[in-house]
Amino acid sequence: MSGLEALYWAQKYPEEVEAIVGLDMAVPDYYDEMNINIPIMRLGQYCAGLGITRWIPSLAESNAIKSGTLSQKEKEIYRAIFYQKTATVTMIDEAKAVKKNAGVVKEKGIPQVPMLLFISDGSGGTGFTKEKWRSIPKEYISNHNNASCIELDCPHYIHDYEYQRISEEIRSFIR
């Protein structure tokens, strides 16, 4: 959803945005096909409110904990935030509105700012095949003369896996 925010901001305030770097960001066309299950989110909210999610520690074992570079203290903080802030009212409201918001961004067209989009292999919870996940952003920027994609062979939360390469590519992009 943050990808939509970046695109919208660049559309609305083009003088404030010099470039967009997308870390496996979802462009508007993803939302045409994305299945957002609000009842499951509400169930998660209910379980979190009762503290049930704490009884299932594997729920908080995200890629950030398994594959990232968090210290032990940071992992504890991450888990505490996860247990307290799972499926909040704001998160559910955002999920309910995201398809409409994607339509607004899509209608305004692609912002004409430089873009560098990192694309995962689509695994890790996107709900798309590798081919489909990668084809949508490529198509999105296909008529943009200052945009490129870099494919990474890792799950959706690419910053947990390819942070070194991402850092190097961003440094090169902004020079």
Question: Model-found features: residue ranges?
Answer:
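Conserved serine/cysteine hydrolase catalytic core
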Residues: 70-145, 149-150
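The alpha/beta-hydrolase serine catalytic core
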Residues: 38-92
